[in-house]
Amino acid sequence: MSPQTETKASVGFKAGVKDYKLTYYTPEYETKDTDILAAFRVTPQPGVPPEEAGAAVAAESSTGTWTTVWTDGLTSLDRYKGRCYHIEPVPGEADQYICYIAYPLDLFEEGSVTNMFTSIVGNVFGFKRSRALRLEDLRIPPAYAKTFQGPPHGIQVERDKLNKYGRPLLGCTIKPKLGLSAKNYGRACYECLRGGLDFTKDDENVNSQPFMRWRDRFVFCAEAIYKAQAETGEIKGHYLNATAGTCEEMIKRAAFARELGVPIVMHDYLTGGFTANTSLSYYCRDNGLLLHIHRAMHAVIDRQKNHGMHFRVLAKALRMSGGDHIHSGTVVGKLEGEREITLGFVDLLRDDFIEKDRSRGIFFTQDWASMPGVIPVASGGIHVWHMPALTEIFGDDSVLQFGGGTLGHPWGNAPGTAANRVALEACVQARNEGRDLAREGNEIIKAACKWSPELAAACEVWKEIKFEGSKAMDTL
């Protein structure tokens, strides 16, 4: 061995494997305002201390690897490493812990949700020291939030574009989601928009299939929009799904929508990917298009309470990547969503500053530094009897989206939309008069039925409908 090698070997380097907690568990650490903070629900393997499991997550999602390496000496680990700085047991759960990890801001590329997730969740979920791992929440510091454009327009700009104020917006997903020709699809859009809706919508898997190519659908839907606008005097829209197999094709479809003069396009942000979504968001801001976001595939990631990622994290990521609407669950329909938890991430989408509130699943105070807000979209198994609860729960800055609850009306599409619009207007008027929607909702709807036969027919059809099931999977 050369003298030079002997000297290097004697200065602070010892080959081999050592416990992660010796380097990455730092309970004395005081977090910085610029740190990205993460709350992981960790289920360690039997015999693995929570400190070691939490430190392993911090290491493998930042600077660490399974063994000591020479090149550790070429940088400052104290500056760049992630730190597990606090651990607390999960109440009511054996061998589960919330491990809090702080990441220095320099670890992340500016304006890239893709890079942020690649670092924080890209490699740690298959790690042997943990039996299961779930990312419950992230604190995005203002210093990092300001590197993102965020939503193309935001809530106030959308209301100004649509000239609609003081009530939730109404939408409808065209059904059947697959199989209609472009002309029949456009006909259904027209009937719904003419009947009183603000928006109609492509479903998440409507792209460009043999039975209906995207360009044909765009043209017939644009015709429906213009005809309905001329007859109602209201601004209308249809979420034209621009999701495609390549980013170039996606932008081409969005550009065609812009040429048609329609107000809004749509993207499946999880299946399409964050890089594609951010690119489309930039295009939409530059070209005056609103951007509706569908969360297709989210339950693959967020439904299990012990493993994966909570939707509040995906919601924060969407606000950073860019979108003016996103589906958020309903609390009352066919898709899962517990009320306080749902309202927690709805606030994270809409508000500028959100206080820590563990009862609603919010682990960190979040300051968005004036980033535009996102409108939550309630959809999935909802109908006219749900209108009072939806109006009370989601408030004005929301889209209430009825698919089967519109197109399933016994008299057809237009009467179905009229029923929904009358129910909404009745609930908004009652709320503005000071009535309690939660307690008096059914009476309000029944009273409105007296002057709307369409609503009366809808109430009769769906009076017995309930979506029963076990309690929500998510727990605090």
Curated annotation (Swiss-Prot):
Note, other: The basic functional RuBisCO is composed of a large chain homodimer in a 'head-to-tail' conformation. In form I RuBisCO this homodimer is arranged in a barrel-like tetramer with the small subunits forming a tetrameric 'cap' on each end of the 'barrel'.
Gene Ontology terms: cellular component: chloroplast
Lineage: Eukaryota, Viridiplantae, Streptophyta, Embryophyta, Tracheophyta
Active-site annotation: K175 (proton acceptor), H294 (proton acceptor)
Needed co-factor(s): Mg(2+)
Residues binding Mg(2+): K201, D203, E204
Gene Ontology MF terms in the entry: magnesium ion binding; monooxygenase activity; ribulose-bisphosphate carboxylase activity
Assembly description: Heterohexadecamer of 8 large chains and 8 small chains; disulfide-linked. The disulfide link is formed within the large subunit homodimers.
EC supergroup of this enzyme: lyase
Family membership noted in the UniProt record: Belongs to the RuBisCO large chain family. Type I subfamily.
Modified residues (N6,N6,N6-trimethyllysine): K14
Cellular location(s): Plastid, Chloroplast
Entry-linked SUPFAM superfamilies: RuBisCo, C-terminal domain (SSF51649), RuBisCO, large subunit, small (N-terminal) domain (SSF54966)
Cofactor remark from the record: Binds 1 Mg(2+) ion per subunit.
PTM comment text: The disulfide bond which can form in the large chain dimeric partners within the hexadecamer appears to be associated with oxidative stress and protein turnover.
Swiss-Prot/TrEMBL catalytic activity: 2 (2R)-3-phosphoglycerate + 2 H(+) = D-ribulose 1,5-bisphosphate + CO2 + H2O; D-ribulose 1,5-bisphosphate + O2 = 2-phosphoglycolate + (2R)-3-phosphoglycerate + 2 H(+)
Site positions for Transition state stabilizer: K334
Any one biological process term the GO annotation gives: reductive pentose-phosphate cycle
Propeptide: 1-2
Binding residues annotated for substrate, in chain numbering: N123, T173, K177, R295, H327, S379
Originating organism: Setaria italica (Foxtail millet)
Keyword tags: Acetylation, Calvin cycle, Carbon dioxide fixation, Chloroplast, Disulfide bond, Lyase, Magnesium, Metal-binding, Methylation, Monooxygenase, Oxidoreductase, Photorespiration, Photosynthesis, Plastid
Modified positions (N-acetylproline) in chain numbering: P3
Residues recorded as bearing N6-carboxylysine in the entry: K201
Name of the molecule in the record: Ribulose bisphosphate carboxylase large chain
Role this protein plays: RuBisCO catalyzes two reactions: the carboxylation of D-ribulose 1,5-bisphosphate, the primary event in carbon dioxide fixation, as well as the oxidative fragmentation of the pentose substrate in the photorespiration process. Both reactions occur simultaneously and in competition at the same active site.
CDD domains associated with the record: RuBisCO_large_I
